[in-house]
A protein has these predicted regions:
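Short solvent-exposed beta->alpha transition segments
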Residues: 105-127, 250-265
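N-terminal secretory signal peptides that target proteins for export/translocation
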Residues: 1-7
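Terminal "cap-and-tail" regions of soluble proteins that handle hydrophobic small molecules
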Residues: 35-62, 173-311
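Hydrophobic ligand-binding cavity/cleft-lining segments
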Residues: 33-123
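Bacterial N-terminal signal peptides
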Residues: 11-25
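Glycine-rich portal/gate segments that line the openings of hydrophobic small-molecule binding cavities
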Residues: 119-174
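Signal peptide processing junction and immediate N-terminal pro/mature segment
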Residues: 24-36
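Envelope-exposed proteins and targeting segments
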Residues: 66, 79-84, 91-94, 147-149, ...
Length: 311
C-alpha cells in the first residue's frame, strides 16, 4: 500500500492509487520520513514515461465502454505519475492472489489491527472502499494478462484536507515480472505502477497547486509499504504456513473460497502440506500475527492521532 506509515492516510494499491491512495489510512514509524525523499526522487512524471505507459495499455483488447473511459482518462489527465519500481520478495502465487484479491489483504490488515481501511467486493473484480476519514470510492479490474493488470476507479474525498468535496477518476497500470536471482533464492518480482488521476473540475486547481506533492509522495510510500507487507506475508508463510492458514480463516469480510485459496497458497509456500494442516494453539497464532504487524502502528493508535495526512 508503501513507507506510508509515517503517513496518516492511505488507500490501496494494489489497489489503489485512486483518489483514495492519497487520502486513506495506514500509518508508519518515524524513520519513513527520511526515506520519503529517496522514494519520491526515483519516480517520474515525464512525457516519455507517460507515453510509454499509454502505449503499453492494450486498448484493442478492452470492452468498448472501458476503452472510452481509458481514453478519456488519458486525454484529461490532471496528474500522471510513474511510481518508483518496487522489488517484492514473494512467492508468485501469493503475489498474483494479492493483486487479484486486494480485499483479502485489506482484511488481513483489519485482523492485525494496522488499518481502518475497508474494502468490499461488489462482484467479480470490483470493489468499494472507505477509509473512515472522508475517502470513499469504487474500482474495477478491467483487464488482465500475464504480468499486466489495468484498474479503473472513481473516488471522492470530503474532509479536513480540502476546502470542498474532491472527486475524480483514477487509472492504474500495474506491471510485474520475475527478477533473475540465484538458484534456490527467494523469488523476487519487480512491480511497476503508472497512475493517471483525472480530477473533476471543482478540484482541478486545488489538486494541481496544493495536493500534487502530497499525492506523489503518498502514493510512492503506499506502494513501498504494501510491497514490504506482501514480502513479509510471504516470508511468514514460508516459516509458518499453518499460522498464515489460520490467519486466512479469520478473514470474515471475504468469502470462503478466497480464504481457502489463501490458506492453500500458504501451505504451498511452506512446502509441507501435512505439517501445515496441524492445528495451532492460540498463543502461537497470536505470536505470528504480532510479528507480522510489528512494523506498523496499530489502527487504534492511528485513530488517536487524528486525520493529519503526514506524521
Amino acid at each position: 500500500m508503501l513507507c506510508f506509515l509515517f503517513f496518516r492516510r492511505f488507500s490501496l494499491l494494489c489497489a489503489t492509487g485512486f483518489l483514495g491512495i492519497v487520502l486513506s489510512n495506514w500509518t508508519h514509524d518515524a524513520t519513513a520520513a527520511d526515506a520519503s525523499k529517496t522514494i519520491l526522487a526515483s519516480g517520474s512524471s515525464s512525457r516519455t514515461a507517460k507515453r510509454e505507459a499509454v502505449e503499453a495499455i492494450p486498448l484493442h483488447r478492452l470492452m468498448i465502454a472501458h476503452r472510452e473511459a481509458v481514453n478519456e482518462c488519458v486525454r484529461s489527465t490532471t496528474l500522471y505519475r510513474r511510481l518508483p519500481v518496487q522489488t517484492v520478495a514473494c512467492h508468485p502465487d501469493l503475489l498474483e492472489f494479492s493483486l487479484h484479491h486486494p480485499d483479502s489483504i485489506v482484511d488481513i490488515w483489519r485482523v492485525l489491527n494496522i488499518s481502518k481501511l475497508s474494502l468490499d467486493s461488489l462482484g467479480p473484480d470490483q470493489w468499494s472502499f472507505a477509509d473512515g476519514y472522508g475517502t470513499v470510492g469504487t474500482f474495477h479490474l478491467i483487464y488482465q494478462e500475464k504480468g499486466l493488470l489495468l484498474f479503473l476507479g472513481r473516488g471522492a474525498y470530503n474532509g479536513s484536507l480540502a476546502p470542498k468535496v474532491l472527486s475524480g477518476t483514477c487509472m492504474l497500470l500495474v506491471r510485474h515480472q520475475p527478477l533473475q536471482g540465484e538458484v534456490g533464492a527467494v523469488h523476487k518480482e519487480s512491480l511497476q505502477i503508472d497512475t493517471f488521476l483525472n480530477m473533476d473540475g471543482a478540484g482541478l486547481e486545488f489538486v494541481t497547486r496544493t495536493l500534487q506533492p502530497l499525492i506523489m509522495l503518498s502514493a510512492s510510500h503506499n506502494v513501498h509499504e504494501i510491497s514490504l507487507f506482501i514480502s513479509a506475508l510471504s516470508e511468514a508463510a514460508r516459516k509458518n504456513p499453518a499460522g498464515v492458514a489460520a490467519l486466512a480463516n479469520q478473514l470474515d469480510r471475504v468469502n470462503a473460497v478466497e480464504r481457502e485459496q489463501l490458506a492453500h497458497i500458504a501451505r504451498t509456500i511452506g512446502g509441507d502440506e501435512r505439517q501445515a494442516r496441524l492445528s495451532l494453539d492460540e498463543v502461537t497464532v497470536n505470536r505470528m500475527n504480532f510479528e507480522l504487524a510489528s512494523r506498523w502502528i496499530s489502527a487504534d493508535e492511528l485513530e488517536k492521532q487524528g486525520p493529519s495526512p503526514m506524521r
